[in-house]
Amino acid sequence: FPDDNFLTPGCPECRLKENLRFSNMGIGRIYQCSGCCYSRAYPTPMRSKKTMLVPKNITSEAKCCVAKTQYRVTVMDNVKIENHTACHCSTCLYHKS
């Protein structure tokens, strides 16, 4: 099974990156998380397979680069965006359900 320190080759590490489009709007610097963590597929363990309604031979697991902390900023009078202040690898939203 993969450990949390596994990085995809050729993909930059999960970190804050300045969003130049929003930073140039005169409200200060805006940062967003970017980069990779990992995505891996492996054979489903037999004990897990026995509990599945529809048994699958392959299990996939993915970690995405997401904001650990952020705050909302209003731009153009009514558009709210999130300014990320810290990033980490966490379960991807589409894998949580």
UniProtKB/Swiss-Prot annotation:
Role, per record: Shared alpha chain of heterodimeric glycoprotein hormones. These hormones bind specific receptors on target cells that in turn activate downstream signaling pathways. Involved in gametogenesis and steroidogenesis.
GO annotation terms (biological process): G protein-coupled receptor signaling pathway; positive regulation of steroid biosynthetic process; regulation of signaling receptor activity; thyroid hormone generation
Oligomer status and interactors: Heterodimer. Glycoprotein hormones are heterodimers composed of a common alpha chain described here and a unique beta chain which confers their biological specificity to the different hormones.
GO cellular component: extracellular space; follicle-stimulating hormone complex
Domain of life, per lineage: Eukaryota
Residues with glycosylation annotation: N57, N83
Protein name: Glycoprotein hormones alpha chain
Family: Belongs to the glycoprotein hormones subunit alpha family.
Disulfide partners: C11-C36, C14-C65, C33-C87, C37-C89, C64-C92
GO molecular function ontology, one term from the record: follicle-stimulating hormone activity
Subcellular location: Secreted
